[in-house]
């Protein structure tokens, strides 16, 4: 079984070149003994132990410590020492001296010392000799122990486990580095996963199992594998495949296999039913390596030791007890340098826990334990103990491991199984040899590839698999060979020398072809692998390495030569060469390459029985094919028997057969022709059916109401839509910038308005300098004006000797201004944010529209299909004619439909325009929102817009309306509107359902309308003939019975009869013509109905869209007009407020001048002013208003002219019809609405009247009178924005007027009591006179209406809100006329000036307003009699005195007020 069975006796090893195979020698000591004997016989030898090469050929070779460092006793000379050949239970001491013992090397000293420390032997009798027999170095003299010789360096033998079995005990920590144990995973590359994946799996495995563990429990593996989210069935199958040991735990290779199978399944591949052979072998081999390494570690780490303690044991009488060797695994991987000798006196080998050990056996008799002479007295080396008995386990002591051996006959190519020791470094070699980047620049060495593995001559299966994969990786073109240039690159990566590679190529390249096939490449790689593991290259290939292809080819050539030679000799010797050769004789049995004259296994033919077949041709020309393969090919003349050999009967029979065949062929042809005819007719019928269906579908397309307008070029339409969309997108930034400018202007105007209101509400806290810059900022001109004013006041005070009244500073004014500024700025930012949101939404909507337009564009495939089926390119002639015919018919129907639509558009286009205009004239003014049709939807839209209170809601409503309009336009153009991202599927389904229902209703309405029109048309067509036919009947029946006629009754009767016949004939002719006309009309009507079914529906839809577009355009125009009117109205309000303040100040100054009698002309001019206003505002205010309160409908007559289509104006009309505070000019035209608010400051009015939303819900009953409208028209120009602009001139500057005028203006500040009362009267009375204009304003600007300033007027206003409309309906009065309400002294009229309602003023307590205005208002009646002159002046004003020079005073009144810059 073993090639070195005599190794125990020191016999020679295997004769094969190279080192021995693993397990070839039990112990290196057998060879060492002979060498030691030879060395001891040499006189110069100082030590019997010399350096021996006992292990594998590794560089460098180190000395092996083979001695026994026991305490040697001197032995007596002259005696033959016995040899220790067995395992005696008791050994007598040997006399004599032992040879000198070398020192223990340093690398084994710690091991030896550790063994001595652990050794605790039982007390034993002292013996005079050690376990090893000592041999005297001389024959006569007693030798003392000589000095130890040079230490022998340990030599690695490759048998770490075997050496460990002979050690007297295990050591707990052979090396300090082994103290900390981790998870050991062999450095072996798995072929079925990549290196990166294997590294990741190693990391995952180590982190899961922890240190010191080599297997993963089932729970941990389940947790990891469950992360793949595979089905439990698949995971169970993966576990079954991966757990190769069936232990319920996974080693690392099994875990890697499980991860590989999981990845395989996750990628969609199926799991194998069983593992492939290569994967199974790799996993099993690696698992065995891991398990064996664990056993080795446990053996080394065993605590129970039996090593002698050299520090205690000196001379013991009892011999040591020999420990049995421990059976070790055969495939140890970790080769370490081990001590091959016994480091001390042996106490015997103890049985190990891993199996029954070998029991000590005595080889001699128990009494024969004394030294025996051996016949040789020369020096002998110490012989180690040799186990000769058999243990309980039935194993020989330390038997050599079993290696895989080729089982076939010698020299036969075959793939053997992988040796149990594995193939170390084969993966590293395979990885290096694979094609990879950067291999051209690398210099390769044998580092990492060398080893001392035992490799058989034959190639193993694992090797062959790797070599084949490597060959296929390099043979990318599948040429089947590797060229010499590639071989240089591949083999050069092994790092071998060039001569070695040349020998490898010479051995592998059989026949010197210059290239290697698959088998030859495997041979070359195997030789390289053997060379890397220390084996020399052979001079010629052994039989095990000869590839089958080479061997079979050579054998085939030789066999062929032998056959030819034998055949030639046989023919020559037998004379067969002179005979004709028989070509039908088979030589297969004798000329077979496979068998030696055996019977062939199959029906295989060789060349010896070849017979040519003329019918079996390999090529047939296409011209020689028969149609349908119906006619058989005539036989070759060579194969047809000669007709000469046939008899007459046979010839007749053949003729009859041929005739039958011909008849059958004719019948088959007829049948196939009939079948083809049937198929053709069926195909034609189907084609006609398809033609009809296509025509019907085209007609449906042409008549469908939702069909897009056919313009002939959809691309042109799409480009036009894109251009239009781009223009609209370009206009968005411009609109946004305009909105931002408007917001900025509103912000500045709001601040300016607040300043004016605050100055009016808090006169004492008015700032000394009023800013006229942007946003109310104080400019240098304002400072100059204020300085000039102060100097003038000082001069006036110095001239008059009066004290200057310096108003106290109000610290709350800046705070109020700052709060208002923050509020206005916040609102401005919110509006700008909404504008940005709207802009972004519009941009997004535009992008979606653009994408939809782009998606509908022509692609290459669409263009190809369009050119094929619309332009009829690349189709059959019949289909091309059909396409053109279809296009012509469709075009003609379209033209007729357009003509009819054009004819109907004339009479039908006017009523839609007249209906909306005429309908409002007949409806009652109390229900303007009850209109039907399109105005209803517009009204509802407007109402919904006005119902939104916050700007965010209005912005969202505007965005929704814009998207709806755009969707309608896209639907009209045949483009599907994009679905909004925020719309849920349920909402989309509901919307689509409602759209379908609406379309269905519209289609039904269209059908009903068309039916009614058709019936009407038929009635019109049938109407004229029926009276004509009935008239003769009615006329013919009365004449026959007249009995009164007496002259020639027979003649008359004949004439009447002839007449009746003629009339009957005419009637029949007319009826026939009528029937023909009816039939013709019906046919025409049917044709028209078919042609116009969809055109009329589309016409109505288009007309509706056009009307909607016109309405929307008108609505947008009115909206723009309303916005312009609103802006102008705001400017007019600001101007009116400025004029009011200016007028109040002028009035105060004029009253002061009157009291002081300084300027009589100024007082007379002031007296003229109220006189002019009194008849305008006071007289008609109550009289005409009370009388004309009921006839409210007349003002509504002219309203629909401008508001019939605009929902926003209708909402305003609804809110303005009820309240009485609305000025009548609101229903006249947009122009009066813009001019009316000029003199009206809304902030001073009560909150109930300035809020438009509050007015909509307030219970107001009266309506303005037309006379007051006229007065308002006359007064509008007085306070218009134009006049205000004209008033602003250079005269406003202090330097623009004379010093005398400035002095006269400033004199008014000297009288504190009266200015306060006058200012209070003005501030209280002026809002009452101008409270109506805010009601005319549109809803949007209404929210900022209620500022804090109106609180000054609160004492009198909130007490009686219901009668307030009656007084506020006199807005025509200009700002200066607070007293023109003499007739309103009634207690129910709070707004009139304080002098008039002394009872009403105190009756209303002032709730929230500041105390100064309330005090001044309450003290006004008391101040009137004190002065006397103010009462007289007011009396004059009440009497009707008018102020004639109002315009002159207005021009010179803007000195102390700011204005809004354009």
From Swiss-Prot:
Single GO biological process annotation from the record: endocytosis
Pro residues: compositionally biased ranges: 1336-1350, 1371-1414
Protein name stated in the entry: Actin cytoskeleton-regulatory complex protein PAN1
Domain WH2, residue spans: 1429-1446
Biased composition (Acidic residues): 1275-1291
Coiled coil: 643-745, 815-847, 986-1023, 1050-1165
Species of the source: Pyricularia oryzae (strain 70-15 / ATCC MYA-4617 / FGSC 8958) (Rice blast fungus)
Keyword terms: Actin-binding, Cell membrane, Coiled coil, Cytoplasm, Cytoskeleton, Endocytosis, Endosome, Membrane, Repeat
